């Protein structure tokens, strides 16, 4: 009689990483032992994807509106160098994800993929579609999953509410927190969803689907490593004109490793602030830049959005020209800024990027489901890159402007 409450308790409070790994292994085992039984549990994966599909439009709308409405005045003036580094780094990350996807195209096995989209004819048609999606009725945009329209109306509402009373902003913030809590509940069922998705995928298509996931994971992790070890050090070098790698290694070791296991930029904020203190950075700078970075500095999320979106594109055989690819980089970097503070946030914004190519919401949400299957590693690596870069760029901006209290060790003053 006590078994069900115990299982529900473990599902709610246990390690989500271990649970997803267990669901992955259990799904593979069931598909190998009894393919028919594996197909019968496919509804668990379908139910999980439908839940995500239902909550994603509301989540994006509320979070973007709340973020813009509650934006603190004067942050741009005090934080301009850090903000520039954050935005440049996020855009370059999206661009690297796009380039990597073209160098090593990922093609997956998706249900109804052949009929799931209407490919655009080029950048002109993409912009034409984009324009009409922007002016869509907001209720219709929410009902149909038109993420471009949702983003536009949320931004407009956020700007309109920016000068509203603190009570209104507090209510909007409480609403966003409530929606985020609903998402967290849905995410807790990810292990069950992954179990159903993997069992059905292997029973239906064999191990070819998982091999496709391994290729996808290799492209994602390769792009993130390239950003962490090549692009970010180059950005820091251009800012401080000295060897960036002592600082890079310190940020990866003391911030990235912790973030990898917590899988939360918000949870890693105290770790980052302590590291900034050890580096001798001014508290009035990092006390603002670190929480801000946890919100908008999303290099890992930009890579995830661009790579998984182009995986859907290549799976469907959609031709993408250079201007459209650049537009995707921009959209992915902007969308990534809205992925903070939400479990699986970057995955839930994939439909926004997929809509540029006329890919249906059903197919886009299948890509989201694939993201959850590989999320045990992908989300951890993404968070590690996001969070460690917060400290890295804050330190780079402070060092470049001489905004350092004391030289902490040799990290701040090491020359090339």
UniProtKB/Swiss-Prot annotation:
Annotated GO molecular function terms are:
neutral L-amino acid:sodium symporter activity
**Annotated InterPro entries:** Na-dicarboxylate_symporter, Na:dicarbo_symporter_sf, Ser_Thr_transp_SstT
- Please state the span of the N-terminal signal peptide per the UniProt entry: none
Keyword Membrane part of the UniProt annotation? yes
Annotated membrane-spanning segments are 14-34, 43-63, 82-102, 141-161, 192-212, 220-240, 298-318, 339-359, 363-383
Query: What is the recorded membrane topology of this protein?
Result: Multi-pass membrane protein
What this protein catalyses is: L-serine(in) + Na(+)(in) = L-serine(out) + Na(+)(out); L-threonine(in) + Na(+)(in) = L-threonine(out) + Na(+)(out)
Name the keywords, alphabetized: Amino-acid transport, Cell inner membrane, Cell membrane, Membrane, Symport, Transmembrane, Transmembrane helix, Transport
- Identify the Pfam families for this entry: SDF (PF00375)
**Gene Ontology BP annotations:** serine transport; threonine transport
- The reply to whether RNA-binding figures as a keyword in the UniProt entry is no
Q: Where in the cell is it found?
A: Cell inner membrane
Cellular component terms (Gene Ontology): plasma membrane
The cross-references to HAMAP family, in alphabetical order and at most eight, read:
Ser_Thr_transp_SstT (MF_01582)
Q: What does this protein do?
A: Involved in the import of serine and threonine into the cell, with the concomitant import of sodium (symport system).
Which family is this protein grouped under? Belongs to the dicarboxylate/amino acid:cation symporter (DAACS) (TC 2.A.23) family.
Which PANTHER family does the UniProt record give?
Answer: PROTON/GLUTAMATE-ASPARTATE SYMPORTER, SERINE_THREONINE TRANSPORTER SSTT
Q: What is this protein called?
A: Serine/threonine transporter SstT
């Amino acid at each position: 009689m006590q078994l069900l409450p115990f299982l529900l308790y473990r599902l709610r409070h246990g390690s989500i990483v271990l649970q997803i790994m267990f669901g992955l292994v259990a799904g593979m085992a069931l598909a190998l032992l009894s393919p028919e039984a594996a197909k019968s549990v496919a509804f668990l994966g379908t139910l999980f994807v439908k839940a995500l599909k239902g909550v994603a439009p509301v989540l994006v709308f509320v979070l973007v509106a709340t973020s813009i409405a509650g934006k603190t005045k004067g942050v741009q003036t005090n934080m301009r160098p850090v903000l520039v580094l954050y935005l440049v780094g996020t855009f370059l990350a999206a661009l690297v994800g796009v380039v990597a996807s073209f160098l090593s195209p990922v093609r997956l096995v998706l249900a109804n993929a052949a009929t799931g989209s209407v490919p655009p004819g080029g950048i002109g048609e993409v912009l034409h579609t984009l324009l009409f999606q922007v002016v869509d009725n907001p209720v219709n945009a929410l009902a149909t999953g038109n993420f471009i329209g949702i983003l536009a109306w949320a931004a407009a509402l956020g700007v309109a509410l920016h000068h509203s009373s603190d009570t209104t902003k507090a209510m909007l913030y409480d609403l966003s927190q409530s929606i985020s809590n609903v998402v967290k509940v849905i995410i807790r069922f990810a292990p069950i969803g992954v179990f159903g998705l993997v069992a059905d995928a292997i029973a239906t298509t064999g191990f070819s689907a998982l091999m496709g996931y391994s290729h996808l994971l290799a492209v994602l992790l390769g792009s993130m490593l390239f950003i962490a070890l090549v692009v970010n050090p180059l950005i820091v070098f251009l800012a401080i004109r000295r060897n960036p790698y002592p600082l890079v290694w310190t940020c990866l070791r003391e911030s990235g490793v912790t973030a990898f296991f917590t899988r939360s930029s918000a949870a890693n904020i105290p770790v980052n602030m302590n590291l900034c203190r050890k580096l001798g950075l001014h508290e009035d700078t990092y006390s603002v830049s670190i929480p801000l970075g946890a919100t908008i500095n999303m290099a890992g999320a930009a890579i995830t959005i661009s790579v998984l979106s182009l995986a859907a594109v290549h799976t469907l055989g959609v031709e993408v020209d250079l201007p459209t690819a650049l537009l995707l980089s921009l959209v992915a970097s902007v969308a990534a800024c809205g992925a903070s503070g939400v479990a699986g946030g970057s995955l839930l914004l994939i439909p926004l990027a997929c809509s540029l190519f006329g890919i249906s919401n059903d197919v886009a949400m299948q890509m989201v489901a694939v993201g959850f299957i590989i999320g045990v590693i992908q989300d951890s690596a993404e968070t590690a890159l996001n969070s460690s870069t917060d400290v890295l760029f804050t330190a780079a901006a402070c060092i470049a402007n001489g905004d350092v209290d004391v030289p902490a060790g040799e990290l701040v003053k090491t020359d090339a």
